[in-house]
Design a protein with these regions (language model features):
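An N-terminal domain-start capping segment
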Residues: 1-15, 80-102, 110, 229-253
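N-terminal helix-turn-helix
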Residues: 2-68, 72, 232, 236-240
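Amphipathic alpha-helical effector-binding/dimerization core
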Residues: 50-149
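Short, basic/aromatic recognition patches
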Residues: 74-82, 146-192, 237
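Juxtadomain coupling helices with adjacent low-complexity linkers
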Residues: 162, 168-170, 175, 179, ...
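Sensor-regulatory modules in signal-transduction proteins
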Residues: 195-198
């Protein structure tokens, strides 16, 4: 039933029961039953055409997430400060279902177009904020990602073979940061470092971004100490706050 919610996005915010049934390969009668339950729970709302949009309960859940998500609560003040100090746009991201999802965005006037906003997902195999998370995945998770996205991994230059990918990611781990140039197709350059919980498991990343044609591109490349320090401070804050749930990286299955 909850898989129906996966259909709703910025690009496709309104769905009819028939459209959802076709998309999810469900009998229309079952789809109507699921929609009734989701509507009663406030997760979906009906609009004038009889179609459905995301409901008000989602706003309640988002408020809860902003209050208790460790990356958001600990990382938000630091990512704002980092953007102000460097005058670059900044992002906090988490691993979520074979993608990287932005949980906090701070934009500067010269922000590259198409930079991720809160709740927006990007492929796990493109861009500094994604690659620096990929580098710290356990071997069994990384192997699954490689098998499912081998062509994309090769396209962005991470490696055509399994051993090549492992060498590339080992280099990222040795440095503790990642720089990318235009991998997400947005014309953006990014610099990112990983975030960890108290057990050393990767939770997400903090990143800075600018346009590839920015006159300040070399300044971005020189901010490795700053991005690593910010990541370390956030990771330490997560580990030190026992009232927050610092679970391992979101489901990768």
């Amino acid at each position: 039933m909850l898989s129906l919610l996966d259909a709703f996005s910025v690009d496709a915010p309104v769905w009819s029961a028939e459209e959802l049934a076709a998309r999810c390969e469900l009998p229309v009668s079952s789809c109507y039953r699921y929609l009734k339950s989701l509507h009663q729970a406030g997760l979906l709302a009906r609009v004038g055409s009889g179609s459905y949009v995301v409901g008000p309960r989602v706003l309640v859940l988002d408020r809860v997430a902003r209050t208790f998500d460790p990356i958001y609560t600990v990382g938000s003040p630091r990512v704002v400060a980092l953007s102000q100090e460097t005058r670059f746009s900044a992002l906090l991201s988490v691993l979520y279902s074979e993608s990287v999802m932005c949980v906090r965005q701070v934009l500067t006037p010269d922000a590259p177009p198409g930079l991720s906003g809160r709740g927006q997902q990007r492929p796990l195999v493109a861009g500094a904020t994604a690659n620096v998370i990929l580098a710290y995945l356990p071997r069994h998770q990384l192997s699954r990602v490689f098998k499912r996205h081998q062509e994309r991994i090769a396209e962005v230059g991470l490696g055509r073979e399994w051993d090549e990918l492992r060498v590339t990611l080992a280099d990222i781990r040795a440095r503790g940061w990642c720089l990318s140039m235009g991998e997400c197709g947005t014309g953006a350059a990014g610099l990112a470092a990983p975030l960890f919980n108290k057990d050393g498991e990767v939770l997400g990343s903090i990143g800075l971004a600018t346009s590839m044609d920015s006159p300040r591109l070399e300044e971005l490349k020189a901010l490795v100490p700053e991005i690593k320090q910010a990541a370390a401070e956030i990771s330490q804050g997560i580990a030190a706050n026992s009232s927050l749930v610092d679970l391992p990286a979101r489901g990768l299955g």
